[in-house]
């Protein structure tokens, strides 16, 4: 069982390039980061010092202006391809396991056709990809906003290197029952993110048996990362009891 710290959300008490070392010291097995484009690649490589990177996102565009990626936006195909190549180069330099392809804000049949075509094109490079449904409350207008929608598209495309990014918090926010979402889509999921529900703080609670979930992943054939993407209630280190508890339980049951 491998746990990754999301450096965009955790260890924010320190500068970004100090966070990989802090995550390593805290007992994580690796890291992920949303947008590793604000620092030169050599600086990232020095900061990571060989620490594994589970996932990065494609560039979102101007976040403050509401942009959330371009994969599903008709007419933005050239922008998507430029940004994807940037992500591909950065993933290679960081040795990132997966790239999360951000869909952007769009809707309707033309947006879906654009998303499908861009995913097929991106998958042709052979780097493992993910797509992540984001809930409409926090990401209004985002094209991919339902796990069943994501599954339908991926099943139709049949691209083995493209999987669902299962975010426990978003799954609960969208569908109510995150366990039921996982039961439907576990086989399609290639990356897992965890957080507490409903406050998106430390993992656990919300009626979801997190220990049973993580402990059961190997038996279900899941060999990917479990990434912590949450907002610490206080400082990051004081809230890592969940990591110790999950490691202890999983060690006891042989996972």
Where are these predicted regions, by residue range?
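Alpha/beta catalytic barrel-like cores
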Residues: 19-22, 32-36, 68-69, 76, ...
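Residue-level detector of anion-binding/catalytic polar loops
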Residues: 29-30, 52, 97, 128, ...
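Active-site acidic/histidine proton-transfer and metal-coordination neighborhood
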Residues: 70-163, 253-254
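Histidine-acidic metal/acid-base catalytic patches
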Residues: 1-4, 8-9, 13-27, 86-89, ...
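Active-site-adjacent beta->alpha loops and helix N-cap segments on the catalytic face
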Residues: 38-47
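N-terminal small/glycine-rich loop or linker at the start of catalytic domains
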Residues: 1-8, 55-71, 134
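Active-site-proximal loop/turn and secondary-structure-junction residues that shape catalytic pockets
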Residues: 9-11, 35-37, 59-61, 103-107, ...
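Conserved beta-strand positions in the central sheet of alpha/beta enzyme cores
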Residues: 32, 54-57, 100, 130, ...
């Amino acid at each position: 069982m491998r746990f990754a710290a999301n450096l965009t959300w955790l260890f924010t008490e320190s500068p970004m390039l100090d966070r990989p070392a802090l995550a390593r010291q805290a007992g994580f097995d690796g890291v992920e980061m949303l947008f590793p484009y604000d620092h030169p690649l050599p600086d990232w490589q020095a900061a990571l010092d060989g620490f594994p990177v589970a996932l990065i996102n494609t560039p979102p565009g101007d976040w403050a202006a509401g942009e959330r990626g371009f994969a599903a936006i008709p007419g933005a195909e050239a922008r998507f391809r430029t940004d994807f190549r940037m992500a591909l180069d950065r993933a290679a330099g960081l040795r990132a396991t997966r790239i999360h392809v951000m869909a952007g804000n769009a809707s309707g049949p033309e947006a879906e056709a654009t998303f499908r075509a861009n995913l097929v094109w991106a998958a042709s490079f052979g780097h493992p990809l993910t797509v992540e449904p984001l809930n409409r409350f926090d990401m209004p207008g985002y094209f991919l906003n339902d796990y069943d929608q994501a599954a339908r598209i991926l099943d139709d495309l049949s691209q083995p290197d493209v999987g669902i990014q299962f975010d426990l918090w978003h799954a609960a926010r969208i569908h109510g029952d995150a366990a039921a979402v996982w039961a439907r889509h576990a086989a399609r999921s290639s990356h897992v993110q965890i957080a507490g529900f409903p406050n998106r703080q430390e993992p656990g609670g919300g009626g979801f048996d997190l220990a049973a979930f993580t402990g059961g992943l190997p038996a279900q054939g899941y060999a990917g990362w479990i990434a912590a993407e949450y907002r610490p209630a206080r400082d990051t280190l004081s809230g890592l009891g969940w990591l110790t508890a999950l490691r202890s339980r999983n060690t006891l049951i042989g996972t």
